[in-house]
């Protein structure tokens, strides 16, 4: 018997978030592969951007599911709520990531470390 991933993931909010992360991550990866081929970004930049977009899409999708469920209502109300909550969550995620990156870049400028050095230190 085949395994049906989407219905399985749709049974829970974390599952819905995982599904959103898969879709958002795939879209980010497709974008970054094109940018890599055009030599507009490095491998490290592509990996970091893909990771950020994957997590952001998953969180936004999960939050939109929670909001739509909490509000209830008809199809239009549920879709509208999911859209507004998803946009707000993704905006907040992106803004938070931007602030963290500014702080990291400020520290990087102070000690002269490259993105690769910082990533290597974080993974060690």
UniProtKB/Swiss-Prot annotation:
Keyword Transit peptide: no
Any one GO cellular component localisation term in the record: magnetosome membrane
Record protein name field: Magnetosome protein MamC
Subunit structure: Probably interacts with MamA.
Biotech utility: Foreign proteins fused to the N-terminal membrane-targeted domain of this protein are expressed on the magnetosome membrane, subsequent purification of the fusion protein occurs by extracting the organelles from the lysed bacteria using magnets. In this study human thyroid-stimulating hormone receptor (TSHR) and class II major histocompatibility complex (MHC II) were expressed and purified; expression is better when the endogenous gene is deleted.
Lineage: Bacteria, Pseudomonadati, Pseudomonadota, Alphaproteobacteria, Rhodospirillales
Additional comment: This bacteria makes up to 20 cubo-octahedral magnetosomes of about 45 nm in diameter which contain membrane-bound crystals of magnetite (Fe(3)O(4)).
Recorded domain comment: The lumenal magnetite interacting component (MIC, residues 36-56) binds magnetite in vitro when fused C-terminally to maltose-binding protein. Isolated MIC binds poorly to Fe(2+), Fe(3+), or Ni(2+), but improves quality of iron particles during iron co-precipitation experiments. The lumenal loop (MIC) probably has to form a helix to interact with magnetite.
Cytoplasmic side: 2-8, 86-124
Membrane topology (Lumenal): 30-64
Region MIC, when fused with the C-terminus of maltose-binding protein (MBP) or expressed as a fragment, improves quality of iron particles during precipitation experiments, binds magnetite: start-end pairs: 36-56
Listed result of changing residue 45 to A: Fused MIC no longer improves iron particles, does not bind magnetite
Transmembrane segments: 9-29, 65-85
A GO molecular-function descriptor: metal ion binding
Family label: Belongs to the magnetosome MamC family.
Location(s), subcellular: Magnetosome membrane
Superkingdom, taxonomy of origin: Bacteria
């Amino acid at each position: 018997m085949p395994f049906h991933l989407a219905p399985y993931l749709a049974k829970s909010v974390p599952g819905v978030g995982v599904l959103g992360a898969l879709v958002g991550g795939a879209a980010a990866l497709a974008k970054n592969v094109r940018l890599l081929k055009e030599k507009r970004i490095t491998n490290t930049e592509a990996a970091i951007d893909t990771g950020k977009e994957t997590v952001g899409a998953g969180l936004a999708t999960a939050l939109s599911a929670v909001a739509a469920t909490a509000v209830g209502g008809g199809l239009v109300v549920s879709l509208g709520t999911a859209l507004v909550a998803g946009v707000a969550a993704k905006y907040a995620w992106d803004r938070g990531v931007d602030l963290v990156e500014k702080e990291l870049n400020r520290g990087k400028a102070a000690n002269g470390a490259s993105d690769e050095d910082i990533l290597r230190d974080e993974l060690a």
